[in-house]
Each structure stands twice: as C-alpha cells, then as structure tokens.
Amino acid sequence: LMDQGKIVGVLGGEHSTPLGLIEAIDSKGENFGILQIDAHADLRDAYEGFEQSHASIMFNALKNCKNLARLVQVGIRDVAESEIEIIKSSDNQIHTFFDWDLKEAQYNGQTWATQVDEIIHMLPQRVYISFDIDGLSPELCPNTGTPVVGGFKLEEINYLLFKLAESGRKIVGFDLNEVAPGNNSDWDANVGAR
C-alpha cells in the first residue's frame, strides 16, 4: 500500500503492534519522525522479561530504524528512571513534552496553541503518528490496560492533529492502540473512534 502512495494505519490492542509498520516506513530510506501521544515513554529495553512489549515499542523503533530522525513524545506522565536516562542521553533524538511540564506552563499562562506550535516545530517533514489512547485523561479511556491520572482532553489531541496537518508535514503512517471497551460499556471504543 505504501508503494501506491497510501497512508497505512494500524489499529492494535497492545502498543507493540505497530513496530512492523514503523520498520516498513524506515525501509523506504527517508528520514522521518514519530509523534507519540502516550502516558508512558515506552523506552524500556524489556518489560517483565519481554523485549517486544507495549513498554518497549519506542526503544525498539529507535534501535531498529536508522532513518528515525526524531521521536517527539507528548503527554508522558509515567516514566521509569532508566527511560529518563535514555531521553537525556539521546543527543536530542528524543524530545519529551512531559504532562506535568505542559500543565505547569499552562497554569503560568502559556496556551495550548503555543505548546502545539512548539511540539510541531520539533518534528521533521515526514511524520508517523503513534497514539496510545492512555495519552488521554483516564475518564475518556477507563478500560485501557494502564490508565494514568492526568492526560489530555480529546479536543486537545484533535487540535494538535489538525495543526500538524496544517503545518504541511507529510503523515507517513499512524497507529491507534490500547483501546479496550469494558464489559458493560463501549465508551473507550466510542472515544477511540473519534
């Protein structure tokens, strides 16, 4: 599909599912960046003994993809010390907009529009979007596997994505992961579909 100029997307339950697509985009030989919307950094080399897990997807993408120029993480609010060390030692290949930093700047008067401009400015011209639904506030996705207090409203993410499209950057692929409807409600699926 990519050879036909199509934008390929992956809908997965667990966040490790898009690694194959990210590697396929990398195999085209052109630099690209990843916009990761997530509560977690996903930079662990392994999680509970598994090297291919939802907690390792971005670690593996950085390790396997030689054309991945920049990883821009947005909304991260649950991070291990080892992941912070990876971010710090990445020579600016990883730029993380932590949830608490974004919120503190807003409390001090910075607008979401200004923050979105900063986020988009960090991205190269070709962008892959990786959206783990737990990047949203937990009341919007209470049944996801690892909800974390804090996060975004849906309209904030929609604004970010619209502004990314308006910026002239080329979207080369995307994923939406960790959407898990509950036993008594399809609320999470409804939010994920929007």
List each language-model region with its residue ranges.
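Conserved alpha-helical scaffold segments that buttress catalytic/binding sites
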Residues: 1-194
